[in-house]
UniProtKB/Swiss-Prot annotation:
Gene Ontology MF terms in the entry: lipid binding
Protein name: DegV domain-containing protein
PROSITE patterns membership: DEGV
NCBIfam families recorded: DegV
Length: 281
């Protein structure tokens, strides 16, 4: 039995450490258009250059989801396939994956495919992808993994801290009124992915220190009790370190990873932004 874990650019991993036996990890990239230039969000993407060009251009930049054909290519060569996409509320990637699943099963009826709408992005997607690899490593069957990952997803959440939201507003991913408030000097948006996968405002924090304490306050309020955290961030090592210290004061055994955002997550989180996936319960 061979396995594949497939994710789009909502996932920040470009490779998975300790990949399970007989398992491959495939990334299906979204694209980002800056002016007339198209950036493909794969391992070769120079994210710093893309961001530099984005801030230098006066025209609105935008992202585009993978086609069903992109997913079909990624499916090839495995008996069991798990797909994790960025929230379907904000991107057509999930729909493309579902279309590809239908087409692929018509040609390969003996293959198992499970498509997961993360209803999220960044760190929470990373947690789901990492968990799939662990479940495959544990020797579970396809159906058992479907059950386990569904249960696990109900115990993960996304918290984000953003100093800039221009791209989210311009691309219709965030309310303009919220965008106007966050656009004020030194105001950061502390929010979450809601139950339907939309971006919801929790707090408007004035200044760095208040955003740090607000983020910690919100994960505790949501039910965090020392589980794993993955912080995907755009050039914000300082926040990651200080937030980790804050968490470990209360939960010394907490596992916390900090990883750079993908091209897509960098595009939407912008400079200094964080997309934090965490376990609750």
């Amino acid at each position: 039995m061979t396995w594949k874990i497939v994710s789009d650019s909502g996932c920040d991993f470009r490779e998975l450490k300790d990949l399970a036996l007989d398992t491959n990890f495939e990334n299906v990239p979204l694209t980002i258009q800056v002016g007339q230039e198209i950036f493909i969000d794969n391992a070769e993407l120079n994210i710093d250059l893309m961001m530099e060009k984005m801030y230098a251009t006066s025209t609105a930049s935008k992202s585009a989801c993978p086609s069903p054909d992109d997913y079909l290519k990624a499916f090839a060569g495995a008996d069991n396939i798990f797909v994790v996409t960025i929230t379907g509320t904000l991107s057509g990637s999930h729909n493309s994956a579902q279309v590809a699943k239908k087409l692929y099963l018509e040609e390969h009826p003996n293959v198992n495919i499970h498509v997961i709408d993360s209803l999220s992005a960044g760190g929470e997607v990373d947690l789901l992808v990492q968990k799939l690899n662990q479940l495959i490593s544990n020797g579970l069957s396809f159906d058992e993994i479907v059950q386990e990952i569904t249960n696990y997803q109900s115990k993960t959440k996304l918290l984000f801290v953003l100093a800039k939201v221009d791209n989210l507003v311009k691309n219709g991913r965030l309310n303009k009124l919220i965008g106007a408030v966050v656009g004020l000097p030194n105001i950061r948006m502390v929010g979450e992915a809601g139950p339907q996968g939309t971006l919801e405002l929790l707090q408007k924090a004035r200044g760095y220190k208040k955003s740090l304490s607000a983020a910690f306050e919100e994960i505790i309020k949501a039910g965090y009790a020392g589980g794993e955290i993955i912080i995907s961030h755009r050039n914000n090592d300082k926040f990651c370190q200080q937030f980790s210290d804050l968490v470990k004061e209360k939960f010394p055994n907490a596992q916390i990873q900090a990883i750079p955002t993908s091209g897509l997550c960098s595009f939407y989180a912008e400079e200094g932004g964080l997309l934090m996936g965490y376990e609750i319960g």
